[in-house]
Amino acid sequence: MNITRFSIKRPIGICMIYILVCVLGLISFFRIGVELLPDVDSKFISVIVNYPGASTESVEQQVTKPIEDELSSISHFKQVRSATRPGRAEIFVELDSQADADMVAIEATKKVSRIRKNLPEDIDEPAVLKRSSEEYPIIQIAATSKDNLDDIFALADSSFKERLQQAAGVADVDVTGGRTKEVAIEVDKDKLNYYGLTLQDIITAVRKENVIVSSGSVYTDALEKTVRLQAQYKAPEEIQHLQLKGAGGRYIELGQVANVQAKDKRAVAYSRVDGNEAVSLEVYKASGANIVDTADGVLQQLETLRKDYPDYVFTVVYDQSHFVRDSLSNTLKTLLEGLVTTGLVLYLFLRGWKSSMAVMIAIPTSLIATFFLMYLAGFTFNMMSLMGMALCIGILVDDSIVVLENIHRFLAMGKSADVAAEEGRNEIGMAAIAMTLCDVVVFLPIAFMQSATGQFFKQFGLTIVFATLMSLVVSFTLTPMLASRFYKNGVEEPKGKLWSRLDDFEAQTIAKYDVLLRKCIEKPKKLVLGVLAAFAVAVALVPLGIVGSEYMPRTDESAIQVNIELPTGFNADQTNEALLLFEDYLAKVPEIEHYMTNVTTTQSMGKLVIALKSSDERSKDVWQVAQEIRSFAKQNLGEIKVRVNEIQSSVTGVSGGRNLVRSPVQVELKGSDMDQLVADSAKVEQIFASTAGLKDIKNSYVKGMPELKVTVDRDKLKYYHATVNDVAQSFNAAIGGRSAGVLANDVQNHGNDTDIAVRFAGGSGYDIEDVRAIPVQTGRGSVFLGDLADVEEGVGPITIRRVNKERIINIQCNLTDRPLNEVVKELTQKLNAAGLKSTYEFSGQATTMNDSFAEMAMALSLSLLLIYLLLAVLYESVFTPFIRMFSLPLGIIGAIFCLLLTHNTINLYSLIGILVMDGLVAKNGTLLLDYTLTLMHEGMTAKAAVIEAGKTRLKPIFMTALTMVVGMLPTALSLSAGSETRVSMAWVIIGGMITSTVFTLLVLPILFLWLKEKFPSRI
């Protein structure tokens, strides 16, 4: 039985079916998750190892390389990167999209544990994290109180951190700032030499005397009791009386050679919020976790902390989920605005509430049914899926308008409502199926692209496919059924001046179109040549740079990060002073809501995270504020390097990473010769500086820090019966101090363990002679380090970066107002002419843009091929579908000119807009072509058929184009959070729909008649 006839005959049954579908859709609506972007982040496993006191090259050789080698064989391995700094190694492995981060983290832990015995004994235990060490925190919180900073830090590093980590989706919480306590054993070097002792002797003695030993069990007739030797230190005073055996067997107390006291560790990290000292907590989400859900969990835990610690103030400085929520809310708002404006247009064109009501019932029904399919597919509500739904409005309206307009035509012939509904639907059944399947094959290639970009747009494409298929079903069932009920008494034409004028306008438009079309058919050359010229000019605008291209539009996310870098050798105190000057300026900027300062253990570097007020509460956008900050830094901070980055979560999400402050232009130099890499990086930096449109240039290589190099004399080691390890232990202990255990459950430290550190008194002020005088215990007694090794001054690297086990230097910068493609093209020419001896390649957005654009071009080509094949099957002709294919070039004319007029660019979103436009404009061509063939089969000549088809389909074609344009205007004109990404796509669709609609009604008839004349038997 015909499905349309069944729907008309069984209205109650159809209503019940759609009520069930809507119930399932609404249930799904409340169960679908929410996030900014589809989860296409590459998954990472990071290994962090601290090696106190070790140089960069020592850490690289002894820690980084062995771990890199071991992790390179891990499951789902994609690539390994590392950053090695003095005393710290960060190795992070990028995994493929199929990886289970939890399982791979377990595997990584096992692999690192297996080689632990081959790593230096003095390293801290390696930490394996389910995130990239370069990932950006999703929430940054500052804790302040009237208590001392050491008390704040103690609570933050234990209770606060632990509480926040309980939130689902949290991978890690970094605590910065404040002060940590320690029991410092500061040794008098001269007294130590006098008694013939070394620092290692003290370290060993402290460790041996600070133990809990289980001694077994004792038994009575009724009980078994364990015996435990309790010998842990309770207070620093106990350590002071520790007995040491000096030279000649003489015993002394530790207090005779050292001062033992509880104190704050030397400040190597500062943190402030809005100029007040604080402890910062940076929350990182696990790979694959939902940002909104994770942030909700963190904020809930934060509320419990506020209740449990009323004397503490917790300030949320940065919360990425705010932008996510605002962006999604605004996307949903534009969707609803588009729906309302579409309804108004329909009311005017369909003459009254009945037809409009039929469409306004059909559209939400299709959308609600789509929720159910999205839920089954595991989709979330994000910018892409909601954007797909917003675009669907035009597609869904299109289906309903075509059906209702044709039903109106049959009603005007005097047929009953039931007959008109059935025959009106069936007459255009083939065209409807063709149009719907065209939409499906347009978006399927996008949905199944394998790259990160393809995965990013998967939900966008499939959401449109789901909605389009549901719309097709609705147009065959619900819409005809509603029409048969609404028009039971025929079409009631509304009365009044407005409707009369609309009728007159419609009749005049059709008459003028008839005249114009006949003139174009009689003299087609001018129109065809004009269209070809317009197409050539439009396409030329892109390579000429008049319409620029970039990877992604910039977004104002109300957040800025400032990184400062002082000349090499400056310490944390000096870096802190520079940041204090910066804070004085920021406190006076009215657009800023909060700012948080961090100076970390990389002593000559610091950062500021700046949260701006919401966009509707400030007069300047984020780029204007950032530029003013750059100007201040240039005028007031002298030689200090300052980089200002606008935080961009919506851009990095597409490129598969979460470093929200990474620059769009990056060049990586690779090679084994570090000196050559350094020389080439200086050339690249100069090229960047001489290229217009670039700012915030940063070279990852920093001139080495001054260092003292100790070169052992192996002959002397042999003579004194000493080893390299003896020298290393004594040297490291003297310079950086060594841990000698902990003061367990220290009541003075909120019950936390307090580190016991052994070092020389005044150890931070060593010169070369002090180093040579460091005592080393050998087989022949205690000697000076200078007796065993040569000590000389030198320079060592600050950071060594590696990619896939090869050293690299990264040079990056931000853009001003030049399109990314122009900059990359110019840089490529300059770099090729520079005579670089190292291998170079672009990374970041430049690479992603080229790859994504190429893949999008392939998807567009595949879509066109699939559409052609589909139409060839439906029409059983190889020439007829060829006519329809001209709809896209006709649309591209308006799309590119619209980008030019609105100052937008070719980017990933505007390319998607071209794909969407292709599916939409194809409907007009298919509708016109299908009715022309129908009339020819009824006996009309080709010319008469094409003119009559144009006149008959003018109204539905114009209505669908207008509703699509009006429906897209709220998106195109939006100034809300996150709208920047959608604007270019909306203008492409608007411009493409306008020119394609006009030219389709004129050019396609000419092309059809020309092909009919040339190949009469094949059309």
Predicted regions and their residues:
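Structured binding elements
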Residues: 47, 164, 460, 985-986
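Signature of alpha-helical transmembrane segments and their immediate interfacial
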Residues: 1-34, 428, 497-551
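Hydrophobic transmembrane alpha-helices and their membrane-interface caps
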Residues: 24-30, 35, 340-409, 466, ...
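Extracytoplasmic/periplasmic membrane-proximal domains and adjacent transmembrane bundles
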Residues: 6, 37, 48, 90, ...
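Solvent-exposed, membrane-proximal periplasmic/extracellular interface segments of envelope transport
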Residues: 58-130, 190-211, 232, 573-661, ...
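Helix-loop junctions and hydrophobic alpha-helical segments within the transmembrane domains
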Residues: 317, 324, 328, 404, ...
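Transmembrane alpha-helices and their membrane-interface boundaries in multi-pass membrane transporters
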Residues: 393-407, 429-448, 455-499, 608, ...
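Membrane-proximal juxtamembrane linkers immediately C-terminal to transmembrane helices
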Residues: 33-49, 84, 131-137, 176, ...
